[in-house]
């Protein structure tokens, strides 16, 4: 059987177009998701985790919603590797559950949103091969939460070269873009994959007429703004000022920012222009021209995005918004735990680890 024929072999629901077929089951799905969100780690857990060693943190999550994942993988992995695989497994199973409990238009929107994990996995596979990582090391970072199955990704990770991976994806929608990868332009390919994802997601949302889709669109557009703003700060700090260098790195469809207007402004003027946006109160204290790290700025913007998704989920409580809010917060929890594990493993101070966390 061809690899591409197996990519969605275990997840047929991920490939079905339910945009017009089937019945959306909002009350049932939202009730289930609210129960799932109530099981996310409370913010009070994180100071405790920072005071623990790796073994203690592993025992802690083993007593939480990650219990089955840790137990399932404990015979094969240990330490940070165990945590990485357990977190990824839990994310995949959690999101797969969301696909199974949603129907109709709701399912269609959830599936479209989760395709971001296919983009993540393709990037990880290419990056791994370029840097000669082992198949095992590559698998540690893959998350089977999109349309690709764990088995198919294992086969891709086992390929000898990035060219073989691209050839295995010959019949996928990503192949025309991946053909442009020559082994030296990874940053370009990764950026184009991101833009491809958002173009597809905006296409799935369409021209929103219902309150439901308008909220969905607003959350996605806010995310695009946050991504573009972080990239603009990186480029400004790196001294990149040319419009033709900056605009190819921007994602279209943001909520408020106009990257083409901000791109060529000197740093001080760029910051002044941001004072007119909703993001200024969030970042005003961390935009000095002599700042050496963007970690705090990124954390604040991510927190704002998370908080905004929650606010919007309350605007329309029986809609896709609470489900999208849960997906976002679940991902953030896994990211926080991964940062703690890896930080402890590499000997980072608790203060440095804490600075990277986004705790709501």
UniProtKB/Swiss-Prot annotation:
Q: How does it sit in the membrane?
A: Peripheral membrane protein
Q: Name one GO cellular component term.
A: plasma membrane
Supply the name of the protein.
A-type ATP synthase subunit C
Q: Where in the cell is it found?
A: Cell membrane
What are its GO biological-process terms? Answer: proton motive force-driven plasma membrane ATP synthesis
Which PANTHER family does this chain map to?
V-TYPE ATP SYNTHASE SUBUNIT C
A Pfam family annotated for this UniProt entry:
vATP-synt_AC39
Task: Briefly state the protein's biological role.
Answer: Component of the A-type ATP synthase that produces ATP from ADP in the presence of a proton gradient across the membrane.
Q: Which family does it belong to?
A: Belongs to the V-ATPase V0D/AC39 subunit family.
Complex and partners: Has multiple subunits with at least A(3), B(3), C, D, E, F, H, I and proteolipid K(x).
Protein's gene: atpC
Q: Per its UniProt record, what NCBIfam families does this chain match?
A: AhaC, PRK01198.1-4
State which residue ranges cross the membrane.
none
**Cross-referenced InterPro entries, in alphabetical order?**
ATPase_csu/dsu_sf, ATPase_V0-cplx_csu, ATPase_V0-cplx_csu/dsu, V-ATPase_V0D/AC39_subunit, V-type_ATPase_csu/dsu, V-type_ATPase_csu/dsu_dom_3
Q: Which Gene3D superfamilies match?
A: ATP synthase (C/AC39) subunit, domain 3 (1.10.132.50), V-type ATP synthase subunit C domain (1.20.1690.10)
What HAMAP family does the entry give? ATP_synth_C_arch
């Amino acid at each position: 059987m061809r690899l591409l024929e197996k990519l969605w072999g275990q997840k047929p629901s991920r490939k079905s177009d339910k945009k017009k077929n089937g019945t959306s089951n909002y009350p049932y799905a939202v009730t289930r998701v609210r129960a799932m969100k109530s099981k996310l780690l409370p913010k009070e857990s994180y100071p405790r985790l920072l005071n623990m060693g790796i073994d203690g943190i592993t025992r802690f999550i083993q007593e939480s919603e990650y219990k089955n994942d840790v137990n399932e993988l404990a015979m094969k992995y240990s330490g940070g590797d165990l945590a990485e695989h357990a977190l990824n497994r839990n994310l995949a199973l959690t999101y797969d559950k969301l696909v199974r409990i949603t129907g109709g238009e709701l399912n269609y929107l959830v599936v479209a949103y989760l395709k971001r994990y296919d983009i993540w996995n393709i990037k990880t596979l290419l990056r791994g091969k370029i840097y000669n990582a082992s198949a095992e090391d590559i698998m540690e970072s893959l998350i089977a939460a999109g349309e690709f199955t764990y088995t198919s990704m294992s086969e891709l990770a086992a390929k000898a070269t990035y060219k073989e991976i691209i050839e295995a994806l010959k019949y996928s929608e990503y192949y025309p873009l991946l053909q442009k990868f020559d082994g030296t332009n990874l940053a370009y390919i990764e950026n184009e994959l991101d833009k491809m994802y958002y173009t597809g997601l905006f296409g799935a949302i369409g021209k929103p007429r219902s309150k439901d889709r308008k909220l969905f669109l607003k959350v996605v557009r806010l995310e695009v703004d946050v991504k573009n703003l972080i990239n603009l700060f990186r480029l400004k700090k790196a001294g990149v000022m040319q419009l033709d260098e900056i605009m190819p790195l921007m994602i279209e469809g943001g909520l408020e920012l106009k990257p083409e207007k901000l791109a060529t402004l000197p740093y001080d003027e760029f910051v002044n222009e941001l004072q007119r946006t909703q993001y200024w109160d969030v970042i005003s204290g961390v935009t000095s021209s002599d700042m050496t790290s963007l970690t705090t700025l990124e954390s604040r913007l991510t927190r704002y995005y998370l908080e905004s998704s929650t606010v919007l989920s309350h605007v329309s409580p029986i809609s896709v918004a609470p489900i999208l809010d849960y997906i976002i917060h679940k991902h953030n929890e896994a990211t926080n735990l991964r940062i703690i594990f890896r930080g402890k493993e590499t000997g980072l101070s608790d203060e440095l680890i804490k600075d990277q966390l986004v705790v709501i």
